[in-house]
Amino acid sequence: QLLDKYLFAIDLEGGATFSAMLTNPFGCAIFTLLFLLICYLINKGEVSDGIEKFNKVGMPALFLMLVIVIIRAVTLPGAVEGLKFMFKPGYAVEAGFIEEAPSLLNVVATAGGQMFFSLSLAMGAMITYGSYLSKYENLKKNSVVIVVADTCMALMSGLAVIPAAVANGIANGVPYDQITLSGPKLLFVTLQDVFAAMGDIGPLFGIVFYLLVLIAAISSAISLIEVVVAFFVDRAALNQRPANRSRVVLWVCAAVTIESLLVAIDGLGASGVFTFWGTDNWNDNFLDFMDCWSEGIAMPLGAM
């Protein structure tokens, strides 16, 4: 009863659970704090003891779980329509997924935003991790490997999600233009329905997939926290006042926690706590506001 009241509605299924969570600021805040506690415990150690050890296990596990989910996703009835949506030019308009093709400028802007975010450009991550490399490392080779690996993982992620979402929509008689193919609802509503439709094996694939999402989220969070931590630690070293890494990580995580709690409490706008006026992309919820600020303004300016 306590879990039902304060964390989530345990008697609900699929998208209903997600909707219940969004309207429960306390539950969202608790899970946010637990996530950031994990990040703190990983970051507070030396890089080789914390982040490096996590990634040595987490990244191969992520790849393996992604392959498992892809195999199941592309073998679902109707998955071929999702593959056409991804890889056949013009098919999204032809089949009715969207009314008209986006403009070239829109495509370039969207691809550019994805590039900056996916490769952690203009946010200090590459500089920070690069500073930990040996001087004997081949930077040109590493750059090519990173870009190729990132592109492959992006395509694999699409193969794990889009065909399954389209197949689920077809199975439920949902018109193509009403199938959710992006955003949190795709991840936490549509895909839950997909796993539920798989029968007895569905929960297993669901567990594997959401563990995959968790590992990806943790690896991204600890890398960005490390950027800020490294800045303060290195600045203290330059001033010949060595900083206590654990203490720096604690203060950085405390600041991140405050901002993260604002997003969690807002519940993607479901709680009605925050309302923004301005452009259409800024007025839905606090997460969209921060996303527009970071990807639309801060990251491009930082890159320049």
Model regions and ranges:
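Membrane-embedded translocation segments of transport machinery
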Residues: 52, 56-222, 236-248
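Transmembrane alpha-helical segments of multi-pass small-molecule transport proteins
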Residues: 3-44, 120-127, 207-211, 221-225, ...
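Alpha-helical transmembrane segments
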Residues: 227-243, 286, 304
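Re-entrant/interfacial helical elements at transmembrane boundaries that shape
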Residues: 160-165, 226-233, 269-278
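Hydrophobic alpha-helical segments of multi-pass membrane transport proteins
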Residues: 217-223, 248-267, 279-282, 288-304
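Hydrophobic core segments of alpha-helical transmembrane domains in multi-pass membrane transport
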Residues: 1, 30-44, 60-73, 162, ...
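Inter-helical loop and helix-membrane interface segments of multi-pass membrane transporters/permeases
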Residues: 1-48, 78-109, 184-188, 268-289
